[in-house]
């Protein structure tokens, strides 16, 4: 039934069930006259069996299935392009009404991470990030966020890839906290035992620091938090991240600390992301400034070698400089890692996502 659904001919009154978390799905099913336990049954079909055909949901009454068909549908936008890196990273592109988003799967020995997008484009215009240079189109719906995970799991199963998705990171296109309501709703589905069932410690939301939204987030959901800091002081951050002129480092870290005190998912500390830009933010003095800045913030630091794209005149810090920077932080007592570049050859690495089709390999 739904395998070849024409999304443009669906009545506006119909609801895509991928837009509903468990609570909202329960209210919807009750409005159809279904029993309470039907909620878990429907979610199991959707998220365990990836079923988009109500006729196949045989443990649900015919009456309820008929009403579901009349009032709702299940639709996950399919990937239209796939690129596979030499290191096993896979990048998928989704077309949503002629606008593109990208999703990246990164397999490792002990885990497999899916990087999802929360917006089409991004309004923050961080100078070192390709997504921001493409401009902002719109927020993704809950169903469009969930569809990335849904389709990724289906695609991995089709490929007989046995490495299940163990971690999900909101580090793709867009600023998650500028799509707060939909991102939080999607997160509840990701964490729900009848949804994707991931642990909150295995789900990470990365933000540039939208302070009012971050303050709200701590009362909405508990997941691992990453702060895209990228500078040891406001002077540098103002230059490379224009959002800092609105929410400066002090306000961002203050809000992050409040989230940490609320959270159980961040016991090991908040992740501080720091892109390494040659002669901009990578000096020994910058490392010392960063250590002072974070001295009262329970944190672990992830240094990110800058991934190039056409446009900016940045250079990535060389390996020796990155190692020196990391060692200074380690000597100051900070857990410091250097991110391994994944998928750089297919423009799937951190800061390279644009949603532009390049015809490397089409589905």
UniProtKB/Swiss-Prot annotation:
Reaction(s) this enzyme catalyzes, per UniProt: adenosine(2503) in 23S rRNA + 2 reduced [2Fe-2S]-[ferredoxin] + 2 S-adenosyl-L-methionine = 2-methyladenosine(2503) in 23S rRNA + 5'-deoxyadenosine + L-methionine + 2 oxidized [2Fe-2S]-[ferredoxin] + S-adenosyl-L-homocysteine; adenosine(37) in tRNA + 2 reduced [2Fe-2S]-[ferredoxin] + 2 S-adenosyl-L-methionine = 2-methyladenosine(37) in tRNA + 5'-deoxyadenosine + L-methionine + 2 oxidized [2Fe-2S]-[ferredoxin] + S-adenosyl-L-homocysteine
InterPro entries xref list: Aldolase_TIM, Methyltransferase_A, RlmN_N, RNA_MTrfase_RlmN, rRNA_lsu_MTrfase_RlmN/Cfr, rSAM
A biological process term (GO) from this entry: rRNA base methylation
EC class of the enzyme, as a word: transferase
Record keyword rRNA processing present: yes
Alphabetical keyword list: 4Fe-4S, Cytoplasm, Disulfide bond, Iron, Iron-sulfur, Metal-binding, Methyltransferase, rRNA processing, S-adenosyl-L-methionine, Transferase, tRNA processing
Cellular component, GO, one term: cytoplasm
NCBIfam families: rRNA_mod_RlmN
Name under which the protein is recorded: Dual-specificity RNA methyltransferase RlmN
